[in-house]
Amino acid sequence: MRVQVPPRVQIQNEKQNENEACSSEFSSFFTLTLFNFDSIKMKFEFQNLSVYKKAKIFHQSTKSIVNEKSLKNYEKDQLSRTSFSIVLNIAEGSGRFSKSDRRNFFVITRSSVFECVSILDVLKDNNIISQEEFESLENQADELSRILYAMIKNLSEA
């Protein structure tokens, strides 16, 4: 005895089989893609950039001032956020696909370096940091600024 299956159920079964096939194909592709990335052992490229490493050192240096000196809360906040944004914008800019996007992030990053120097200059004028501390940080910032300028210029060329 043969049971008659209503047409709507047949369509649902066909769609389910089609979805399972697509799902299986996607799973195979996804597994293959993961396997390929695992075999390459990719690292985030920005972590290899000397400017990123130097920015982290600069951020740590400014962080020690924030932690060791008696700054007003707004000074602590502004210096911490600005020096941290240097590190973050280098990373984020490096992840952009177009040259103009990367360039814009590095321009913003360089502006943050300038902002940090101005904060440090005010702290020096208010005798919160010494001339030696200021010069040390200013030298680090100058190096960051020069590297970023070269990166910006390179990305600006056709």
Predicted region positions:
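Amphipathic alpha-helical assembly/interaction segments
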Residues: 3-158
